[in-house]
Structures are given as C-alpha cells and as structure tokens.
C-alpha cells in the first residue's frame, strides 16, 4: 500500500540510502496512459529513465544502485536487471516473476468485487488476448514468448537478487518466486529466497 511504501522509503532514507520511488506513467501524479507492466515495455522504460536520473544525481554513487520491486514491480525489477548493468542488486517482494506461459495459464489475479472474477474489460488485462492475437499462443510461437520473458535471460541478470514471498499470497503464487530461484540457481546466479509462512501479498505479518 502507499502508506507502507512511505514507511519503507523513510526507513531506507534513515539508513543513509538515497531513495527514488517511481510512479509509472498513468499512476499517481505521473502523466501518460497506464498500460500495465506485462504487455508493454512502457513501465520498464520509465524505471530505466529513473535509473539514469539517479546516476546523474550528484550525491549518488552510480556504481551502487539497487532496485526494490513489489508485485508487478518485481516483474519490472527483473526486466530492468536484464536490460541494464547499472542495477547492481535487486530485492523482490511477492513478485510476478514467472515466465510468460505461466503468467498466461497459471495466474489469474481476481479483481476486487462481489464476484471475485477477472474483468475482461480491464485494459490492463487485455494484454494476453492482444499478444496472442498478434503473435500466436506460447505453443504456436514459443520463440516470441521467450524473447519477451526476463526468465529466458537469467544468465544476464546484472547482480544478486533477494526474493521474498508470503506462502499465503492470494494475489501472486509464491511458486513463482520458487521457480525464479531455481532458474537463477541453475544459471549460477547469486540469489536468495525467503518464504514467509502464512503471510500475505504485502508480507504484513513479518514487516509491520
């Protein structure tokens, strides 16, 4: 939640870190159209621009930039660490860090509401249908789906990654983090995983 993010940022700042918390385009006070983080590179571009801004900040050490991402932000963090070597370490909480076939077939985050079912009219959910219509399904065109999945490039991740996930997360399966841990470990990449027993998507029991 926004309130918790403020607390996290405050704590990091008190520890001496320079912290920049981004609002993706179309979110918060940012301009532009919200496009979602899975069917478009837009949010990743926004974050990479933020990294470039931090590198230019006089008091920042450009060789010690880390990134923390929660939920969709975990997906963006993973993507960003594949794209650039500027991010030296990543921490991901409750991250949407599975391959695209898993996101297509093994993840349906319910919308809030009385029916608790996905809303097909939600523009942030249309990415599945639009990509399949344009490029075919993962079975029909596995090369395309691998090409847009950061999981296919774990050997190129720019630094160590620490994964955190509550085992009672009803928004993003904790198995996604387990799979990424296994992929990175198999690739010889430095990675840690912490599974918080019985905790939720925000890991509110252990981090309050």
Q: Where are these predicted regions, by residue range?
A:
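C-terminal catalytic histidine-bearing segment of alpha/beta-hydrolase fold enzymes
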Residues: 178-208
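Mobile cap/lid helix-loop segments that gate and shape the active-site cleft of serine hydrolases
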Residues: 42, 101-153, 159
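Short beta-strand/loop motif that positions the catalytic acidic residue
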Residues: 157, 163-165, 169
């Amino acid at each position: 939640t926004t309130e918790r993010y403020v607390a996290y940022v405050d704590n990091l700042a008190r520890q001496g870190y320079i912290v920049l918390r981004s609002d993706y385009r179309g979110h918060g006070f940012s301009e532009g159209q919200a496009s979602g983080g899975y069917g478009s590179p837009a949010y990743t571009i926004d974050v990479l621009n933020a990294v470039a801004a931090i590198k230019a900040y006089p008091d920042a050490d450009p060789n010690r930039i880390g990134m923390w991402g929660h939920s969709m932000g975990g997906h963006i963090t993973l993507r960003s660490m594949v794209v650039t070597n500027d991010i030296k370490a990543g921490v991901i909480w409750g991250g949407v860090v599975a391959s695209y076939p898993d996101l297509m077939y093994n993840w349906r985050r319910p919308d809030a509401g009385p029916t608790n079912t996905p809303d097909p009219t939600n523009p942030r959910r249309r990415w599945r249908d639009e990509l399949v219509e344009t490029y075919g399904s993962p079975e029909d065109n596995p090369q395309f789906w691998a090409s847009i999945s950061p999981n296919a490039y774990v050997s190129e991740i720019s630094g160590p990654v620490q994964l955190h996930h509550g085992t009672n997360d009803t928004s993003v399966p904790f198995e996604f983090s387990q799979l990424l841990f296994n992929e990175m470990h198999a690739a010889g990449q430095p990675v840690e995983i912490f599974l918080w027993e019985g905790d939720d998507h925000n890991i509110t029991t252990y981090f309050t």
